[in-house]
Amino acid sequence: MQNLWKNALDTLSPYISNLFDNDVVCINNERYRIQKLLGEGGFAFVYLVQNVSNEKLYALKKIKCSFGNKGIKKAMKEADYHRKFKSNYLLKSYTHQLVKEADGSEFVYILFPYFAKGSVAQVIRNCDIEGSYISEKRILVWCSCLCKALQYLHENVAGDSPKQPEVNDLIMFDEPQVPQNTSNNNLVSYIHGDIKPDNLLLHENSREIVLTDFGSICLVPIFASNNSEAIAIQDKASENCTMPFRAPELFHVKAGSTITEKADIWSFGCTLYTIMFHASPFEREVSQGGSLALAVCNAQYSFPRKHPYSTLLCEIVEACLQREPNKRPSARELLSKIDLQINQ
């Protein structure tokens, strides 16, 4: 048993080295004391840290740079997005740094504001335990915030983006295609790629939210010109996009197909449904014995027979969960409908 624990620690040591409670890390000449682990996923850990000098609290994301320079570039690109995107609804970072540790492993540290209220996912879990619903007014405000974040990404002015797009700048896919609309009104379109309640952080008043986790962001449209590219896109989507929120066009990518920002709109619909009913629309089908992938690809879901929500919210979900991407509304169209309802 002792050897088993030793082997486990040896395996995890590259991820947790120097980041135990009360340990201190130095980022760009500022010292921060680790308070506790807030969350983890993939190659990243998020810690609550306290500035040693002024005692302010922050969130620190530690990203493991696997696969050499490729991993470093991916993590640094994520940090760059957090630093340069100019929207109140996208999480901004304070600073970041590439760090090489004693064992030779490399990490990117990103320092963020600390959101003590946690994520929308935590609110959903609490409501599920209590058997209660989130108010429609609160949901509409959250959706408005998310639509503003998505509109910024999907209709991004090239001057606001971290840099002009290049062939190898995409994060989600290894062999990306240059977006075809970059010369059209100087717009650059990004897809977030992993919209879900866990990635929506609550402000102190719990009213507004910000979108986080930019590790899946990439430029769109992405065209799969052959089977090899189609498989690569599909594989990367399976790595980056959480399955219950993943758009059907990412499950079975075919040569000649194009991935657009409408994949985010599908995820928006899944997220809204989850906020309303505490489970994603397709997980409910699986709980009744179905296949998740099949349910998603067939857009097979249903609403509970009894619930407190208006027809409008259900119609928004239905509009977003169209199998054909071009039939889904844009973030701008969703925002217009949602804000109209809020202001009534």
Curated annotation (Swiss-Prot):
It is found in: Endoplasmic reticulum; Golgi apparatus. Residues 76-344 form the Protein kinase domain. Keywords: ATP-binding, Endoplasmic reticulum, Golgi apparatus, Kinase, Nucleotide-binding, Serine/threonine-protein kinase, Transferase. It comes from the Eukaryota. It holds the Pfam family Pkinase. Its EC number is 2.7.11.1. It catalyses: L-seryl-[protein] + ATP = O-phospho-L-seryl-[protein] + ADP + H(+); L-threonyl-[protein] + ATP = O-phospho-L-threonyl-[protein] + ADP + H(+). Its main location: endoplasmic reticulum. The active site is at 192 (proton acceptor). ATP binds at residues 38-46, 61. GO terms for molecular function: ATP binding; protein serine kinase activity; protein serine/threonine kinase activity. GO terms for cellular component: cytoplasm; endoplasmic reticulum; Golgi apparatus; vacuole. The keyword Cell cycle does not apply. InterPro entries: Kinase-like_dom_sf, Prot_kinase_dom, Protein_kinase_ATP_BS, Ser/Thr-specific_kinases, Ser/Thr_kinase_AS. One of its GO terms (biological process) is vacuolar protein processing. Belongs to the protein kinase superfamily. Ser/Thr protein kinase family. PANTHER family: SERINE/THREONINE-PROTEIN KINASE 16, SERINE_THREONINE-PROTEIN KINASE 16. This is Serine/threonine-protein kinase ppk13.
